Amino acid sequence: MARWSLGDHSLSVVKFLFSTLVCIILFTPSSSALIVDASDDWNESFLVEGGRSLLVEELSTTWCENCAEIDPYLMEVADAHGSRIAMVTYHPTDGFDAFQPPASQHRIERLELTHPGIGSTPTFIVDGGQQRIGSDSWPDVQKDILSEEVKNLNPSELAFVISKNDNDSFTASIQSFNSKGNGDNISQLTFMLAKHSQLVPDGFDNPGGSHRDRVVYGVSECNLQNNSITYSSGMLNSNIDDNSCKNGFAVTFEPVDQFSILLIHEKVYQNLSSEEPSSSYGVVEFAFRNLENNQSWNNLLIILIGFTFIGFLWKYYENKNK
């Protein structure tokens, strides 16, 4: 194999190119999501285009101590990754959680088909991959994100328009959709609503802060095979115009101070199993929330660069001592 020399030591060209690719993925901006600062006035409609984002799903509860430790940092982590990931959190209907949205429980039941036994909190799943359990599993989550990005070569192309109505509700409607050959006739389009800075009400066990982020409150699913809405919860209205999910699928939801709305192309519920890959075909997110300050972003960027640099030094050290 051809090799790249560095003094008396050498590195595999393949390893070098792969490391370079990882750096490009980490530090090159992407345009698969749109974030609008909630402190600004909303005075226009927004076109959201993409599909390449990776869906990162978290199972969490408001009473979970380990969740309380890591949750405050996850929004900054999501900001550090930018549009490369779309992170949401499901809170179960367990009788103890302070939120228990039916839409979250629906998505948990979907995960139970592909990940039997899921239930520990916090649990993270990157694009339908392995369960990563516990707050100390975050390095594995980061590794999964990088691995899936390298493999995510042909995502579906998604676009929707988000607008604010006269009564302060919001409507998201499909603008265009190209499956790129993914999941033809056996897939669905899903609008998912996640609310940010949700106040934890009194009377519930809460070892963490007063608010939680990325709580999934709304889900609406449109089957592309028969152009029907097969599930809807947490939305004021879900409808299909022109009898077409691809062109006429739209949802309206109540006024929310801060939120994310995701459009996902994924397998239908009936075609999920623990023996088949359950990764999504395409994901794009629109976020309307308060942006983390630039210093937090700069610190996280320094950390990411630092870890990458340490990785190169460690690889050099390993080769030097062979």
Task: Describe the residue ranges of each PLM region.
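Short loop/turn motifs at secondary-structure junctions
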Residues: 18-21, 120, 259
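Secretory targeting signatures
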Residues: 1-39, 64, 294-322
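Extracytoplasmic
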Residues: 51, 82, 119-121, 186
